[in-house]
Amino acid sequence: MMWRFLNYQRYNAFENMAIDEAIFRETIKNKKKPTIRFYGWRPAAVSIGYFQDPQSELNLEQCGNMGIDIVRRLTGGKAVFHNDEITYSVTAGVGEKSFPADILGTYKVISDCLVQGLAYLGIKANLAPAGRALKDMELKPCCFSNPSRNEILVAGRKICGSAQMRTKGGFLQQGSLLLTFNPVKALSVILPFNTSEHLAKLRDSVAAINEVIASPIETKEICNSLKKGFADVLGVQIVEEPLTSGEILLKNDLIKKYEDLRWKTKR
């Protein structure tokens, strides 16, 4: 089977989310083949989960002072500070044989692909068991504070956070693989505000690719290894193809939604 691949490019927060939604909607509508996409963020941004309240979970004033965009995702989960990372999205229609018809099963398959990709980089990763969380600390709004079942750990520390949305027609899963991590910046924009205790706990629980290997790796090499991980675990051929004209038109229209304050503040 053949899958489509969109290689790493950096966009602003609103265009990133518009592209993912356009791919998802066109995949469901036209029963298109699955898509894997890698991307980055320019400028830095905070994405919030579909059900989160930015007023109570973000330091909005600090985001403004630092020039950090705020965008609401279609997927659930917690807030993520996007800076130096590779974000992935996987979109597939209902009945795609590579995935079970449930959220946790799909999470595990995608995590297995990412773990294999990391292994090609010499990084030994494993999946988090159910119920694991930071001891004696609640950083609830922050995605990387609490590894969920089937999320990816390196030496017990979370290196990737993911969230998923499903409809009757298919699913969209988004996730962030950290290249480097700055807990001071992350906690300056995501509540609770940084204290020495919060910073220490978060620093001890989060890993980043270029901090767990001997020397930094180029983003292109990382993406190639992750792509190979998907191809090998799923047993599919992955071919690089651009957005379709229909996806581009839809993306351009959806950008307006993601920029709209009403979308950012809805619950």
Q: What does each model-identified segment do?
A:
Residues 1-57, 61, 65, 69-73, ...:
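Active-site loop/lid in soluble adenylation, ligation, and acyl-transfer enzymes
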Residues 35, 74-79, 139-140, 164:
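Catalytic micro-motifs at enzyme active sites that drive phosphoryl/nucleotidyl and oxygen chemistry
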Residues 39-40, 80-81, 153, 178:
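Well-ordered beta-strand positions
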Residues 41-43, 65, 81-85, 147, ...:
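Short connector loops at helix/strand junctions that flank enzyme active sites
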Residues 41-54, 86-94, 112-116:
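Extended cationic-aromatic binding surfaces that line active-site or macromolecule-binding grooves
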Residues 48, 66, 75-76, 155, ...:
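Short glycine-rich loop/turn motifs that provide flexible caps or phosphate-binding loops at active sites
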Residues 60-99, 225:
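A glycine-rich, hydrophobic loop/mini-helix early in the fold
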Residues 94, 98-229, 261, 267:
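Catalytic beta-strand/loop module used to bind and position nucleotide/cofactor moieties
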